[in-house]
Amino acid sequence: MNIVITGASKGLGKAIAAAFAKDGQGHSFFFCARNAEELEATAADLQGRFPQNKVYTQTCDVSDKTALQQFVAWINNQVTKVDILVNNAGIYLPGSAYGEDDGTLEKMMEVNLYSAYHLTRMILPGMINNNPSTGSGGHIFNICSIASIIAYPNGGAYSISKFALYGFSKNLREEMKPHGIKVTHVLPGAAYTDSWSGSGIDPNRSMEAADVAHRVDAAAQLSPQACVG
């Protein structure tokens, strides 16, 4: 399969890629992230552990719509269709809705919502054109958060942006049913990743990124008739 993952250089994105890669089927991965060095290191690690896969990378600031267009053009130059899209890129800045800095909401929305919205719209035409009679036209995963459905103090703009991504995902799911394209929203709680390093958070009180990744991989393997959130 051809699999696109944003924010793939570390954390959940890296773990999800590894979960897909280890099945031995020989996938082609298209990764993007802002940090070129981390992205290349992740690609080399994945390629080394699972050599039957092909890994392609491109640096991309997903909050920049033009950069996303270039990313999709680069993908389309190499493959004719995308089977799985994982909208994983995201940022978290703590703060209250009334006390956070001006511009925080805009930045959160650009990365956590608009990137998924625009990239999905760019990828979908190819997925819709697949539309096989089997009803398996592709699968889109939106990595939301428990903050998408449960508010908490100092969630602020982050929680707002994840609520919005969840709403986008639910709406898109209904729109894609006639095209045989699955849309799954993933709502993990706190998962310990590199971004928590030095925070003082006890890793033993958080899920591992691999826990979330395994659920994504399992959902991707279900039959077209199966329904998961």
Locations of the language-model features?
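Substrate-binding pocket helix/loop in short-chain dehydrogenase/reductase
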Residues: S96-A97, D101-M109
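Conserved glycine-rich Rossmann-like NAD(P)H-binding loop of the short-chain dehydrogenase/reductase
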Residues: Q25-A41
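The beta1-alpha1 cofactor-binding region of Rossmann-like NAD(H)/NADP(H)-dependent oxidoreductases
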Residues: A36-E37, T59-Q70, D102
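Active-site helix of classical SDR
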Residues: T120, S161
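Residue(s) in the substrate-gating loop at a strand-loop-helix junction
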Residues: S145
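Conserved glycine-rich cofactor-binding loop
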Residues: S9-K10
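C-terminal helical subdomain
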Residues: H185-V186, I201-G229
